[in-house]
């Protein structure tokens, strides 16, 4: 055997690099926590097996979770199977372990130390190590991923990730924060360093349809483009025996079919081709979810009241538009929209009016803010004073030859009736609203390219109110950012930056409330509705714990994330299909669960 000679200087350099990579020393005074006694929310009666079939309205434009076109609704399925260091208990909001088994806090108030589970594995069998978390920082800072928000956050908000051996790390943020916020804002998910060979200018295109290794209970196993995506449960998942994971993630397969029309999807559900169907929309709950399938007990209905931050749902006004850049027009438009009429008629009184962009965040929500009420007299006065006195033969106002005509883009056909009512009343104030229904993919692209005038949508919620991504001028006037109103206000910028940097909880609350007032005053967002519950129907072979959801459940039928608590009873499935053929009846089921119902409205 031949041995290659190594220069002594090279040997010293290699040794030096090895020592430096593990040279960090843990502080001696750390107090480690684990919260292993957190209460499970699954049922010991749950059984494994079977498949769960659901639908999505559009096929995802990419499997990437960062970069162009990645911010689609499908991303939530992928992210839910990528564990972070810790998570929040869905009922108590206390910190619970995931990849980290223990954590401790640095004296600086902005550093958290984590001990990683040595048994953690990627779906391809490779171990999850400290290097994967260090790589996350490099990955998210790379310009090649074409993701400005991530570039900014991981560059300016997370200042360092340090390694103390293969299974211990620390994360330090830019400023000190309360302990629970350190985990949320500075927490990381690992990125498989062994999988990404090179992050270069071709990364976006190269990884558009790559199935990335993950750490969660399921992995994508089959893709039929434009038709369906299948996830399979890992039979040897490394975290399956964790106390909080037992009796969860029970079905063997999760199949997501692409069905581009909700009415057609409901027909698939009634045929037994889908296992559940969300019935939040009043039209479906009151008009469709009835008949023999329900009367005979084959389909069961659940209403579950939750208590969590509410989606920022409403109309977003693009201030780069020549008409909507005028603040009086924006305020007048808000007064010309009769949302209460929509709630009473189309929505059957089921929904409530959302009052502000951030609601349900406790003291971080400004409860003194109310959405502008429908008031045609006020709308007309404002527009007259703003120079829009003249009207055409059709009643639409005109100023300097320009009609007060605006396009509303929206992505759900089921919303057409509600917007038609608003359109009719707005015309009484001389405002023409043209309804532009788009498929989900086109709707998303239009908004991300800032090509809309008015966009109807709802943003997902977070742990605390988020202002920077939605309202800071850094994200205005350019595509692929979440400031879709293009709000550009230096005073608001200043307070957003102060809010992000503030370490005192009381001061942060005051800043959050002040920012909420400024955003309301800017009139770039018109709140629409909030829904204080989730509800749906399912075939009786889907079984649930006594509480079919958690305090923060947005749906009862989530197979991933903090869900996965239902299971398929194969015996009941066979029995139900036979009963349907021979007309055997069961007791009808229409249950309401209100243990987490809000005592007072926001």
Segment roles from a protein language model:
Residues 35-37, 56, 77, 224-229, ...:
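Detector for C-terminal structural segments
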Residues 82, 89-94, 186-248, 253, ...:
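Gly/Pro-rich hinge or "lid" segments in bacterial periplasmic/extracellular proteins
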